[in-house]
Amino acid sequence: MTMTITPTITRESLLSLEAYSKYRKENKPAIMAHRKLRSVRLGENLNLQFESETTLRYQIQEMLRIEKVFEEEGIQQELDAYVPLLPTGHNWKGTLLLEYPDVNERKRELSRLIGIEDRMFIEVEGHARVYAIADEDLERENDEKTSAVHFVRFELNAAMRAAVKAGAGVKLGCDHTNYPAHTSMAPETLASLAGDLI
């Protein structure tokens, strides 16, 4: 059983719940490895999951499976939620997770990290920083705290895309006052992300 891979995700390209159950058993380890490859930790508490057709298709199919959704309207709602996170060839899109297992610490840190999503950046070797465009779908913070989940997009110009495809190094960073951090992306992660770019 194979899943149809398309440039976008449509209702017609999704598997039925029964077909997905079989597909999932055979392919979950490979999908989890792909997700891990495209996940970049920044410090102890930030994790950026760079999305792809594979990660988003998996997320949609999992939501449909868990919620036992098979009606057209419910399927369309999941598509409307996740398809905008597909990279378009000129950008990288991701889900930023602020991970604090302790409830009290999470509450405290989310209040200290208001605006963190706008301070996330990537820096392609030899090029200026590109800051994230965050939460285009809705407001995810208020005056008291930020959300533990943000959706971010990094737009890369043609020179940056060419540099990444040619093997340039890339840093992921954050220059929020209360969470300054940066890391160099692993070559295997960059190889996967380079495949998103045209």
PLM regions and their residue ranges:
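Long, contiguous binding/interaction regions
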Residues: T2-N91, E99-I198
